[in-house]
Every structure is written in C-alpha cells, then in structure tokens.
C-alpha cells in the first residue's frame, strides 16, 4: 500500500472516555455520512469498559438470553453493533480505532482492511515483531484480517459503509490477558448454544490462540501509550491532524443514527450496563 489515503487532512476525535458503546457506533455512522459528503477524513479512538459487542449473527443464538445473563453475572453489559457478524470483548485494556474516509463502490473491502493493517504495522514497527493478517479460526469473531503475532490474535477488523463514507474499525487488545477475554466468549457461546446445531457456524473458541499486545511484545504497554503511537504513525504516513468541535447540524445527524441504534437494541431487551 502507498499510504495515499493517509496523506492530507484528518480530523482526530478522542472518545476514549465518557461514551456509552451505542454512542460510539452512532458517531461512526455520523462521521461516515459527513465524510461521504466531502468532509475531512476522521480517525476516532474509543474505549468502553466491560461490555461485549455482539454481532448480527449473535442476535440469532437460540439461548441468547441465557448467554447475556452469564455476561451480566461476570460484570459485562452487551449491545448489538451495526457492523461485523460476531461478538468481541471490550474493556479498559482494549483500544478501538476507526478510520473513516470517503469511498465509492469501486473501493474494495480488502483495500479498507489493508489500510488499517498498514497503520497498525507502522504503530508497532519499532518492536521488530512480524504482524500477520490472516484468519485465526478458533478466536472469537474470526475473520480474514485478524491481526496476530506468532499465531496469537490481538486484533480484529470490521468495516461499515454509510452514505459514501467507509468506516474501518479495529479493536486492539493492549493490556491484560487475551486468553481470559477469549474464555469469556467461549463460555458465552457454550451457554447461548447449548450444543444445538444451527445454520450459522459459531466459533469453536480456543482461548490459547488469543493474547494481548503487552503479552506478545513482552513489555508493559498501556492504552495511553498506544494512542501516542497512533498519532505518530498517522503523521508518519502523511496525515495532517486537527480537532474540530461538533456543530448543531452534526448533533442533529448524530441523534438520527443514535435512535437507530437504540431501536436495534431495544428489540433484544438486554442489559447494556452489566
């Protein structure tokens, strides 16, 4: 990749504190809409503590209510997101990054994933570890652009397109235990499936195939440090970063997308707070 989409003006939006998960996905849709209309590209960071973000397929689990009850008993809330197909674990040690830029139907899905892969490689280049993009089949939310080191997954990427804008979203497991997060999801699927055969194949999770970056890099690493690595990498790849305030028109548009998220989740009657 040439890094060409990184060259030029980007708005940096720091949402690492103070938001609920449904707000995050609503903001990404709003920024997609605006970027599609010609606004500057956006890089947005977000952190949510103790919540499982379920995918569309998870909403069809035969014993979803029991699975949600298990998560709640473990101190985790749950919501259904508007991108991606399966559940992921978020907590204070997981940094989410959204790259939001303009793109039409000719812009391939893989190209969007490659840009995020390029960015993450730049962020952690100094550690000298090879980061691979390939499916880790026994991880939670497996996909062809799972990011791993030595076969252990630390990140997953999803993509959403709204009104001519593209949001490529990644979760980076930075601090803590990757295998403990994976074990939470393994138990969730065990409870929510109860061994039933379904048309959709849910992941058969092996907790040992997931790890955090501080485990894989064998060094102490914090979300705050990685935020600085992100901004430095964006500038290295050619981005000019700025911060802009929300306007009244932006809030109006945001509220439209937020209402859609509320409607999607209200049908499930699940505990979002844990």
Curated annotation (Swiss-Prot):
PROSITE patterns listed in its UniProt record: BPL_LPL_CATALYTIC
Keyword Hydrolase attached: no
Further facts: The reaction proceeds via a thioester-linked acyl-enzyme intermediate.
SUPFAM superfamilies to which the protein is assigned, alphabetical: Class II aaRS and biotin synthetases
Pathway: Protein modification; protein lipoylation via endogenous pathway; protein N(6)-(lipoyl)lysine from octanoyl-[acyl-carrier-protein]
Signal peptide: none
Gene label: lipL
Site description Lowers pKa of active site Cys, residues in chain: 153
CDD domains referenced in this protein's UniProt entry, alphabetically: LplA (cd16443)
Described function: Catalyzes the amidotransfer (transamidation) of the octanoyl moiety from octanoyl-GcvH to the lipoyl domain of the E2 subunit of lipoate-dependent enzymes.
The name this protein goes by in its record: Octanoyl-[GcvH]:protein N-octanoyltransferase
Domain BPL/LPL catalytic: 37-242
Positions of the catalytic residues: 141 (acyl-thioester intermediate)
Top EC class, one word: transferase
GO molecular function list: lipoyl(octanoyl) transferase activity
Swiss-Prot/TrEMBL keywords: Acyltransferase, Transferase
Catalysed reactions listed for this entry: N(6)-octanoyl-L-lysyl-[glycine-cleavage complex H protein] + L-lysyl-[lipoyl-carrier protein] = N(6)-octanoyl-L-lysyl-[lipoyl-carrier protein] + L-lysyl-[glycine-cleavage complex H protein]
GO BP annotations listed: lipoate biosynthetic process; protein modification process
